[in-house]
């Protein structure tokens, strides 16, 4: 039986190639081809399953391929010189060292993508491994991958915060970190290399990997399949293949010594080369004093302060400074100019120094505010010859500007050795005038010839030098700019130049309109038939037939314009005077030509509103500023029809005899259709006696608290409206001047009866004022006075001692003050005392239990917890 002969496919899964061949030959020798057919069928089925699984893995691998951290580390380690990374070169070296350790442990698959291989996978031979060795290898690979990922994350964080620490490779590091973050954001943790598989897996399982044993492959395909499986699962415990060809000897970057000669920079910006003694990140123990400034020779570069400190100290003063002289030549050495830290050398700082210039131009400008001027002529001049442009240096053979009389022959050609340079402009600065000058006209044209304009060396030609000349222009535009500081008006062109509508040029005498010519406005904007002789530049401008203006009162006037025009002369007289009668010109006439605008005339018909809001129109009969003599009674109220509007009276309150005590009357209106007008406040009508008698003067001396403005009494006496209380109401009360107090009804009746009789004014009796008041002796009646001021001759209060006359309700004058008038009978008011005999309802029991502070005898109505009822 095939099952008994050992040809079961399940038993062949763990055999090698030689063992399979030996088993096949043994089966053929015992059973013949029957055993081969069963084996072939089972092998074909396993081959198809392996092919299908390989195709699926190939599709999946093309989707899940993502760059790993090892590939990103390859880009950083590809730089030959790690010193280009600046102060973080040691960190990059550590990253490259970890990458090489991972490659030496895992192999080249650490640098590949995380996806599965895209080919058919063939299992390796079964090799027996030690389980402990496999687990240790897996842990080592996992730790190396984690450390590489952490190191790359730290480098990216430094590149984001301080990219200058990577030196010239800062942009490369940031680009790599940006690609890493993009991969993590798109693919998540798949962008991070997973835990590498154990190298002993295929050897432990042998040929049990699905698809590894493929008998259908022969020769080249089988070798390719074998290499793919070695690439995927490794060689197990077998040693790796040695490289073929020439091997380049390379020094490990981790063991490489630092450079002997490095370049640094001082705080002043100078470059320093040699062995660097700055602080390094991999050296500990030198942290104290890292950020302190060093006096003397600077052996600590600015890179140390940039890497480890947040601030940079100020550089020391330079020993050798480079300054410039007044002529711009550099001078180096110890600076001896004035400084702000030294006092006492202010005298003579801004004076010119003769001899050698040791004061720099920069110091002169900073201390004096102006640039230094050269004190003497240059001893050595530099120039170039006119023909061959060779440099000529030495004493200047040209005439200086302070020497006159050597103008003759200054511009002639020199034979022999040429000692003059090509700077001909220096010869004519203060020398003789040129024979042929070049000037410009007002229109901008060039004029050459003998200059006949005004000169600074010629006097007597000042008259008329700035006037315009008609005819040929022989005065240059430069003369007006230098002597007159004005720009003359350009004369019209004799030959004009214009363009047609199609862009063709037209020259000759222009027949276009001009601003100086009037009367040719009609037809200026019309089209021209026939030959086009020009294009109108000024279109329109004529006077309109109908124009709209506004009169002084604001009324609109339209029609033909009759006011002053700029193109019309002779009508200036009386142009700013007002016109009586119908206004045929408005405000637009006065504003551009007159200094002021006249006031409009009075309106014949006026419209206003009464205090009740009624409209009144007609002739104005109120007071006016232009009319005098009607001031009397202008503020008095008018009975009957109201023919005076609210604009004149301001809606004043009515007479006091129509007012009732305690009632507030509000009179007035606001017109929303017309603009608001401000009116002067009128005089307040008198509400008291117009003749001040001694009796009235005595009453005015009475002072006290003013409670009259409100006109109402509040509080417990709220039903006492109309009662007279206090001093202010006594002062203005309607009562008899003489006699005893009367009831209110009787007093009002007597007042109405005596209103028709003439009032007899009492005689004024002159009284002598005592020089000083003398306190009266104490009496028994004075003891009835209580409160402030009961002491004799000592009055206390807010403001009782403002004068010599003591008034009020204190002292010996309290019992003899004016008696108050008796008012109407008061209504008996009910107080809380009357509720004592009223039966009270029984209090219900408390319905709240468990509350804090509850009481059965508490209040029935409360606002917090524990209320009863």
Curated annotation (Swiss-Prot):
InterPro entries: CSOS2/2B. Residues 604-838 are annotated as: C-terminal domain. Residues 839-869 are annotated as: C-terminal peptide (CTP). Seen in gels as 2 forms (of 85 and 130 kDa, equal amounts of each) which have the same N-terminus, called respectively CsoS2A and CsoS2B. Partial tryptic digestion and mass spectrometric analysis, as well as the presence of the shorter form even when a C-terminally tagged version is engineered, suggests CsoS2A is shorter at the C-terminus, but its sequence is not known. It has been shown these 2 forms are produced by ribosomal frameshifting. Residues 1-65, 182-206, 241-289, 556-576, 831-869 are annotated as: Disordered. C-repeat repeats lie at residues 604-651, 690-730, 773-813. Expression of 10 genes for alpha-carboxysome (Cb) proteins (cbbL-cbbS-csoS2-csoS3-csoS4A-csoS4B-csoS1C-csoS1A-csoS1B-csoS1D) in E.coli generates compartments that resemble Cb, contain RuBisCO and have its catalytic activity, showing it is possible to make artificial, functional Cb using these 10 genes. Cargo proteins can be targeted to these organelles. Artificial Cb assembly in E.coli requires csoS2-csoS4A-csoS4B-csoS1C-csoS1A-csoS1B-csoS1D (but not the gene for carbonic anhydrase, csoS3). Residues 1-259 are annotated as: N-terminal domain. M-repeat repeats lie at residues 260-309, 319-368, 379-419, 435-484, 494-539, 545-594. Residues 37-65, 265-276, 848-862 have a biased composition (Polar residues). It comes from the Bacteria. GO terms for molecular function: structural constituent of carboxysome shell. Keywords: Bacterial microcompartment, Carbon dioxide fixation, Carboxysome, Repeat. Disruption phenotype: Does not grow in air but does grow in 2% CO(2), called a high-CO(2) requiring phenotype, hcr. Cells do not make carboxysomes. Also absolutely required for carboxysome formation in E.coli. Required for growth in ambient air. Its main location: other. The keyword Repeat applies. Pfam families: CsoS2_M. N-repeat repeats lie at residues 16-35, 91-110, 172-191, 218-237. Has 3 domains; the N-terminal domain has 4 short repeats and binds RuBisCO. The central region has 6 longer repeats. The C-terminal domain has 3 repeats and a highly conserved C-terminal peptide. The 3 C-repeats serve as the encapsulation signal for the alpha-carboxysome (Cb), and are able to target foreign proteins to this organelle. Proteins can be targeted to the Cb by a single C-repeat, however more repeats yields more efficient targeting. The C-terminal peptide (CTP) is not required for cargo targeting and is probably on the outside of the Cb. Required for alpha-carboxysome (Cb) assembly, mediates interaction between RuBisCO and the Cb shell. The 3 C-terminal repeats act as the encapsulation signal to target proteins to the Cb; they are necessary and sufficient to target both CsoS2 and foreign proteins to the Cb. The N-terminal repeats of this (probably) intrinsically disordered protein bind simultaneously to both subunits of RuBisCO; minimally 2 N-repeats are necessary for RuBisCO assembly into the Cb in vivo. Belongs to the CsoS2 family. Probably interacts with the carboxysome (Cb) major shell protein CsoS1; this complex probably also interacts with RuBisCO. Interacts with CbbS (the small subunit of RuBisCO) but not the large subunit (CbbL). RuBisCO interacts with the N-terminal repeats of this protein; mutating the third and tenth basic residue of each N-repeat prevents binding. Binding is sensitive to ionic strength. This is Carboxysome assembly protein CsoS2B. It comes from Halothiobacillus neapolitanus (strain ATCC 23641 / c2). The gene is csoS2.
């Amino acid at each position: 039986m095939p099952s008994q002969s050992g040809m079961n496919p399940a038993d062949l899964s763990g055999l090698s190639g030689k063992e399979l061949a030996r088993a096949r030959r043994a089966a053929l020798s015992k059973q013949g081809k029957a055993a081969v057919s069963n084996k072939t069928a089972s092998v074909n089925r396993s081959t198809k399953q392996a092919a299908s699984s390989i195709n699926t893995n190939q599709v999946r691998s093309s989707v899940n391929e993502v760059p790993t951290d090892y590939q990103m580390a390859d880009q950083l380690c590809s730089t030959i010189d790690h010193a280009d990374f600046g102060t973080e070169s040691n960190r990059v070296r550590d990253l490259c060292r970890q990458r090489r350790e991972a490659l030496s442990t895992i192999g080249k698959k650490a640098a590949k993508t995380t996806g599965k291989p895209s080919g058919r996978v063939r299992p390796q031979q079964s090799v027996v491994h030690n389980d402990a060795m496999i687990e240790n290898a897996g842990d080592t690979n996992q730790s190396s991958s984690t450390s590489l990922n952490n190191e790359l994350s730290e480098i990216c964080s430094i590149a984001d915060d301080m990219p200058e620490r990577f030196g010239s490779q800062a942009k490369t590091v940031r680009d790599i970190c940006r690609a890493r973050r993009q991969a993590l954001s798109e693919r998540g943790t798949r962008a991070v290399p997973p835990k590498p598989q154990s190298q002993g897996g295929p050897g432990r399982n042998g040929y049990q990997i699905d698809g590894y044993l493929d008998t259908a492959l022969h020769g080249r395909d089988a070798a390719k399949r074998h290499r793919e499986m070695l690439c995927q699962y490794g060689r197990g415990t077998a040693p790796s293949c040695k490289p073929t060809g020439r091997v380049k000897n390379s020094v490990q970057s981790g063991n490489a010594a630092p450079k002997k000669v490095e370049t640094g920079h001082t705080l002043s910006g100078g470059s320093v080369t040699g062995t660097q003694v700055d602080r390094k990140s991999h050296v500990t123990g030198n942290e104290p004093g890292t950020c302190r400034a060093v006096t003397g020779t600077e052996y600590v570069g600015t890179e140390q302060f940039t890497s480890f400190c947040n601030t940079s100290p100020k550089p020391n003063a330079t020993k050798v400074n480079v300054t410039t002289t007044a002529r711009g030549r550099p001078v180096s050495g110890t600076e001896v100019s004035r400084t702000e830290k030294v006092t006492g050398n202010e005298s003579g700082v801004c004076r010119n120094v003769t001899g050698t210039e040791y004061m720099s131009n920069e110091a002169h400008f900073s201390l004096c505010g102006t640039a230094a001027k050269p004190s003497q002529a240059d001893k050595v001049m530099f120039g170039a010859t006119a023909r061959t442009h060779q440099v000529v240096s030495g004493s200047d053979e040209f005439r200086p500007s302070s020497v006159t009389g050597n103008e003759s022959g200054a511009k002639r050609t020199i034979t022999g050795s040429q000692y003059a340079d090509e700077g001909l402009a220096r010869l004519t600065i203060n020398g003789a005038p040129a024979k042929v000058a070049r000037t410009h006209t007002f229109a901008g044209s060039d004029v050459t010839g003998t200059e006949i304009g005004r000169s600074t060396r010629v006097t007597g030609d000042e008259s008329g030098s700035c006037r315009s000349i008609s005819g040929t222009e022989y005065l240059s535009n430069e003369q007006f700019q230098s002597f007159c500081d004005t720009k003359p008006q350009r004369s019209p062109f004799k030959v004009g130049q214009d363009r047609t509508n199609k862009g063709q040029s037209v020259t000759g005498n222009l027949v276009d309109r001009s601003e100086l010519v009037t009367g040719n406005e009609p037809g200026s904007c019309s089209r021209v038939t026939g030959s086009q002789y020009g294009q109108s530049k000024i279109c329109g401008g004529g006077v309109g037939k109908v124009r709209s203006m506004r009169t002084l009162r604001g009324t609109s006037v339209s029609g033909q314009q009759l006011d002053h025009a700029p193109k019309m002369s002779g009508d200036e007289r009386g142009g700013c005077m007002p016109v009586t009668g119908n206004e045929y010109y408005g405000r637009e006439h006065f504003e551009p030509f007159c200094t002021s605008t006249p006031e409009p005339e009075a309106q014949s018909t006026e419209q206003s509103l009464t205090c009740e809001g009624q409209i009144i129109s007609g002739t104005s009969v109120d007071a006016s500023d232009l009319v005098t003599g009607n001031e009397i009674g202008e503020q008095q109220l008018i009975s009957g029809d109201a023919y005076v509007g609210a604009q004149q009276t301001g809606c004043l309150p009515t007479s006091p005899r129509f007012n009732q005590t305690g009632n507030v009357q509000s009179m007035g209106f606001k017109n929303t259709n017309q603009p608001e007008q401000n009116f002067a406040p009128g005089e307040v009508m008198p509400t008291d006696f117009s003749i001040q008698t001694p009796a009235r003067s005595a009453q005015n001396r009475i002072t006290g608290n003013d409670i009259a403005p409100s006109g109402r009494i509040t509080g417990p006496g709220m039903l006492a409206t109309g009662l007279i209380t206090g001093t202010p109401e006594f002062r203005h009360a309607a009562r008899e001047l003489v006699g005893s107090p009367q009831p209110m009804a009787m007093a009002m009746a007597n007042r109405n009866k005596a209103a028709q009789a003439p009032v007899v004014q009492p005689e004024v009796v002159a009284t002598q004022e005592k020089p000083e008041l003398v306190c009266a002796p104490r009496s028994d009646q004075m003891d009835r006075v209580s409160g402030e001021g009961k002491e004799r001759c000592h009055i206390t209060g807010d403001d009782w001692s403002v004068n010599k006359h003591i008034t009020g309700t204190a002292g010996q004058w309290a019992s003899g003050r004016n008696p108050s008038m008796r008012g109407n009978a008061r209504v008996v008011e009910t107080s809380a005392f009357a509720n004592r005999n009223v039966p009270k309802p029984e209090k219900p029991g408390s319905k709240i239990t468990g509350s804090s502070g509850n009481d059965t005898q508490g209040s029935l109505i409360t606002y917090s917890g524990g209320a009863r009822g």
